[in-house]
Structure formats: structure tokens, C-alpha cells
């Protein structure tokens, strides 16, 4: 089958809403994150979120100040985002909520994956007819905005090559991952030593299921339909919060 002939975009190229996506060769997938109602992913702390703001944080909650410094990775190079962040001269204050301990403070090695979170991820994989990997291995993604005390987000690939059944037909699912959520930002203030960002550690480490679909959406309407299908599928799992 011959490739379709693409014409030049019709309309004002300075106004994105005036252009038809198919004329631009637009095609995308979606990435959906779903928080799980379990304990934290790499510590045995409870998955609790506290209803506090920067003005209502209890005085007895400890605070720790840190600075993240860029370091060379295994390949010998410094990540470009980490290099940029180190030049911003920012410091970070972490408020230790009752459900955060040494692991959340990056003072203790992480524990194995929460078994209930893994079970839910495998259940969702089965709903998507995805193929589980033979071995769960935890990877580290560089996080340089201070929302993770370790400077990394821990992510595990659970399954691949799935399919989401929607009202308009099947949608390919490239990967399903299990990863930890970030800390919640409470405030950003300016000091004589640079910008200071304050985070609450209650959310840090909560399990997230990440679902990434294949790039099969030619327009925003299809994206919304695929998202709605993913949302309904996740809503059928009672352990998704």
C-alpha cells in the first residue's frame, strides 16, 4: 500500500489550533500514571497522604536541608539536566512526615518491591494481555528537581506488548512499569544563598503504575478516547487510588 500524499498545512502556521493534525503527520501515544492504595514501594512505610500546607506543617516534624550535586554516571558523562540544575544554586528542605523514615531520607538502602504493588501491576498486565518480563529489575532515572532525596526515581519494567480494548478498537500498549512517586512540593522561597524548595516526604515512594501506549493516536479526540479506556480499565481495579 502506497504512503498517503501529505499536503502542506492549510491555515495560519502560527496558530496551532488552525492546523489539521493529519496534515502535519501527527501521531502520538499516551502515558498514564495510576497511584496504588498500598504501602510504599521500597520501604514498609504506610501509603498515607497528610492534609498539610506549608503553614500547617506540625512543628514536631523534622526538617532536613540538602543540596544535590551533579556527578558522572556509569558512562563517564554528567547528565545534561543534572548539570543545568546544579547551576541554578538551589537547596532543598525535606519535611519528614510520620510515614517517612531513613529510606525516604536516603540514609538507608531501599527494600525489595512491595509485594502487593507487584501483584496489582501483574493483574493490570493480565487485563492488558501484556507479557510479563522474566525478572523484575529496578532501574534508576535521574531526577534533578529535588523531588527525590536520592536524586533518582526507581522504576521497574513489569510487562510489554499489551493491548487495550476500547470502544473504537484495540490500542497497543508498549510497556507497563512500576515506579515510585515523588515528594510533594510545599513552597519555594528566595534566600540570600539562592532559591530554596520545600518538600513533604509523605508521598515519596508511593507506588505508581505507568502505562505507555503505542504511538497510534492521529488526533486529540483519539487520545482522549484512549485515555478514557485506560481510566476505566484502571478503575475496575479496587487497589488503584
Regions found by a protein language model. Name each.
Residues 2-241:
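Basic, nucleic-acid-interacting segments
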Amino acid at each position: 500500500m502506497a504512503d498517503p500524499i501529505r499536503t502542506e498545512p492549510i491555515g495560519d502556521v502560527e496558530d496551532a489550533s488552525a492546523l489539521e493534525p493529519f496534515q502535519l503527520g501527527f501521531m502520538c501515544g499516551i502515558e498514564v500514571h495510576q497511584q496504588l492504595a498500598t504501602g510504599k514501594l521500597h520501604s514498609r512505610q504506610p501509603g498515607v497522604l497528610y492534609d498539610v500546607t506549608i503553614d500547617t506543617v506540625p512543628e514536631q516534624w523534622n526538617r532536613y536541608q540538602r543540596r544535590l550535586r551533579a556527578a558522572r554516571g556509569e558512562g563517564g558523562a554528567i547528565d545534561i539536566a543534572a548539570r543545568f540544575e546544579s547551576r541554578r544554586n538551589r537547596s532543598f528542605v525535606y519535611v519528614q512526615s510520620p510515614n517517612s523514615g531513613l529510606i525516604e531520607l536516603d540514609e538507608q538502602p531501599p527494600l525489595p518491591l512491595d509485594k502487593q504493588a507487584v501483584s496489582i501491576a501483574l493483574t493490570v498486565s493480565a487485563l492488558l494481555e501484556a507479557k510479563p518480563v522474566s525478572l523484575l529489575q529496578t532501574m534508576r532515572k535521574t531526577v534533578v528537581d529535588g523531588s527525590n532525596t536520592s536524586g533518582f526515581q526507581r522504576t521497574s519494567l513489569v510487562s510489554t506488548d499489551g493491548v487495550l480494548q476500547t470502544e473504537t478498537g484495540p490500542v497497543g500498549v508498549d510497556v507497563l512499569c512500576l515506579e515510585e512517586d515523588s515528594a510533594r512540593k510545599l513552597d519555594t522561597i528566595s534566600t540570600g544563598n539562592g532559591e530554596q524548595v520545600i518538600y513533604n516526604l509523605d508521598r515519596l515512594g508511593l507506588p505508581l503504575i505507568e502505562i505507555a501506549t503505542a504511538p497510534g493516536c492521529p488526533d486529540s479526540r483519539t487520545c482522549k478516547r484512549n485515555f478514557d479506556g485506560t481510566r476505566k480499565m484502571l478503575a475496575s481495579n479496587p487497589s488503584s487510588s
